[in-house]
């Protein structure tokens, strides 16, 4: 991670402030009692479109908007798509979002509500939608916005950690969701540059833990993915994603 990464994150937080919400950092009495420690929750469920994905999407789209692109292409299993559609509507940008045919109807309707055009791919998986989206973008010379395999997106997701440290710098460990690795590589990278002894613990759904298994194996592999309630952090990884090496460098422990 670039030694000035924390500065880029702070700049991103200022850049996207008009497009996101500052979410609460809330003490949890019940989890604190259960664990015998002080537990705080960063409530990104109160974020615009209901997910931290709003941060990375806003940062990348604001950067792309400087070149006034005719259209921007992305792929998603749902939450990233909603985030991109919302930010694009705010910025007056046209986006085309590739989604797997298995996307939940609620997430599909939410994306359409923001006015984005969608393409449902025949394949089931998120990475298949990503492959189709990348191919379409390259064929038509449009910019492609990855849900996680992009440093500007990662920097945007890391603004979550920047907000946390504005409220509380006294903690020993942080537990972060690890799907494609964009959130945890960004937050982990920022926190480790600010608090050298913080422990970063990755949390993945047992039924779909691609990055967890990749870190264990030392390489990205094709694994079986089963249904999970945590569909927002599920799915396979794009081979060659920058988040693999970033996650290896910042994750201290990984659990499912």
Segments from the language model and where they lie:
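PLP-dependent amino-acid enzyme catalytic core
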Residues: 1-256
């Amino acid at each position: 991670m670039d030694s000035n990464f924390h500065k880029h994150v702070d700049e991103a937080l200022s850049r996207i402030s008009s497009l996101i919400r500052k979410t609460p950092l809330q003490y949890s009495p019940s989890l604190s009692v259960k664990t015998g420690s002080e537990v705080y929750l960063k409530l990104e469920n109160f974020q615009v479109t209901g997910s931290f994905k709003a941060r990375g999407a806003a940062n990348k789209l604001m950067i792309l908007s400087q070149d006034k692109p005719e259209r921007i292409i992305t792929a998603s299993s749902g939450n990233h798509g909603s985030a991109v559609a919302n930010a694009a509507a705010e910025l007056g940008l046209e986006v085309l979002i590739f989604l797997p045919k298995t996307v939940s109807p609620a997430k599909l309707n939410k994306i359409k509500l923001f006015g984005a055009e969608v393409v449902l791919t025949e394949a089931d998986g998120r990475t298949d939608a990503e492959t189709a989206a990348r191919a379409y973008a390259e064929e038509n010379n449009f910019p492609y916005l990855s849900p996680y395999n992009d440093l500007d997106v990662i920097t945007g997701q890391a603004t979550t950690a920047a907000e946390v440290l504005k409220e509380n710098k006294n903690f020993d460990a942080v537990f972060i969701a690890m799907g494609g690795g964009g959130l945890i590589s960004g937050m982990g990278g920022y926190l480790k540059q600010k608090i050298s002894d913080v422990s970063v613990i990755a949390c993945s759904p047992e039924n779909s833990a691609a990055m967890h298994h990749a870190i264990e194996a030392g390489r990205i592999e094709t694994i079986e993915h089963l249904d999970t309630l945590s569909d927002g952090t599920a799915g396979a990884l794009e081979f060659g994603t920058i988040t693999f090496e970033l996650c290896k460098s910042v994750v201290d422990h990984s659990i499912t």
